[in-house]
Amino acid sequence: MEALAFPTTKLPTTMSDPQQDLDTLRQRVAQLDREILEKIAERLRTSRSIGEAKRRAQLPIRDFRVEASVMQRARSAARELGFDPALAESVLESLIEAAVRTQVESQPVTQPGGRQHILIVGGAGRMGRWLRGFLEGQGHSVETCDPVDGDFASLAQAGQRTWDTVVLSTPLALLPETLQEALQLPGSPLVFDIGSLKSHLVKPLQEAARAGHRVASLHPMFAPGTVVLTGRTVLVCDAGQPDATEQACRLFRETAVSLCPIPLAEHDQVMGGLLGLSHTVNLLFGQALHRLGLRFEKLGPIASTTFAKQARTAAEVAAENPELYHQIQHFNQCTPQVYEALESGLEALRQAALDPDSEVFLARMGECRSYFFPD
């Protein structure tokens, strides 16, 4: 975006009345707010015109490479103008989301040669809704199967149609059963899940692959509120049908997302650290503060930099879906190992903290430092 050029306003001098100075500055802020909003309205009108041009050219609504370029320009402009690039990213994410909604309001575009009929099982959930918007934005025809506000209440009803691709976005506990039902759908569609754990799916997925079913397994490593995919990752697990895995990847390949292969059997061990351990540490942080009787509203104003960073992350974790977070812990076969490592590490650190010999504590910190900075 071009830098906004606003008319100058005479700012107060040091000799003027303080209250008058404050009023003048507030009026200036109000004027700037109005002009910014006018520019946003102009941007949305332009986005609508872009959407119309895309429809005429039969192009998908979203071009993630363009969005990545927009974000890069925003970060560069913020640095040049002397403010935090993260603020620019936040503003542009909201503008991009609004632009996409504006363009989706019109008839969906078609993707020549690549338009698919896709069914999302569990489509009324947060990730299911995100997937529908994502796939429709690329020009695919998408419907959902969900007893809560789905186009179909069951797979039996959805089975009256044929589908090119079926995406499983149900709660983790339902995935094995849902997979078996999806494999019975007519037309032999591509079937893949997006579950955050795979241990309970390894056997049924591999059996399905050996039976000739086109199955794969993906794991988007981002929240369903994500708008811009730059810097985001989707983990890709091959269940034994490489062609099916590649077909699933194609739905994401032309976006800014990174596709990262990971062996299906190793997925949950990695998630034990990436998800299970990180969730646990943040929940423990909040629980410990609560048990210490330290009220958060009193700590905030005097927070150290480290506390502020940790508290922000812990608060975000605490606000997430507790049912999902329990499933991530419960269904991961590596969870006992994670807690054993956490318990032994905590005990070693406790002993080091209470030991008058600082060398013991320095050794524990050294272990941590060598993990993050091996050389």
Regions found by a protein language model. Name each.
Residues 119-122:
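Conserved N-terminal Rossmann-fold NAD(P)-binding element of oxidoreductases
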Residues 126-127:
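Hydrophobic/small residue at the entry helix of a nucleotide-binding pocket
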Residues 197-201, 205-258, 271:
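Rossmann-fold dinucleotide-binding core
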Residues 298-374:
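Interdomain hinge/lid region at the active-site interface
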